Amino acid sequence: MSELVRTCGYRYGEIAVITGNLEEYARLAAQVFEEADIPYFIDEKHSVMMNPFVEYLRAAMEMAVQGFPYESVFRYLRCGMSEVTREQADKLENYVLALGIRGYKKWSEKWVRVYRGMEAEKIQELNEIREIFAEEVRELAQGFGSGKKTVEEYCRILCEFIQKSNVWQKLKRQERKFKESGDKAMEKEYNQIYGIVMDLLDK
């Protein structure tokens, strides 16, 4: 590519690299271009949608709109952005499935029932995890569950939800990890994604 620019009069903007699997090759291509000091643009609409922060917000909205069903609750919990760890989410899952827990009201109330084969003393630990989740999403549940609102109002609720969470700090930690590992493409994505999302919600 550099040879074409140097010897044939091409400009970098006139050269395209096409792949049938952007998700697999985008990061590798970005690293190669960075190392070769070649200016580039990657159309990463799909991969950005797969960013854990974006997935976290999509799951949060789906969860609130649909009334906290099992599928969207655990999709949210497994994005890696919640204060509930994935290990803790795994501990909740069997209980939620066994007893059909659905709706924010059920998540906000103390659990006392024990299903067959469950060790009774585990209910205390499950309640501690439940409380973390219930408090984390309380204002989101109240905001989305209290009547129809304008798009602007929903965006404000989401902005407040994001700002009160520790998502920004988690994104920064991931950004540092990618920087340390030399993954410049992912470092850049994690550096920019918070601002991009907040700007969109602000508009």
Positions of predicted regions on the chain:
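Polyanion-engaging groove/track-forming segments
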Residues: 1-203
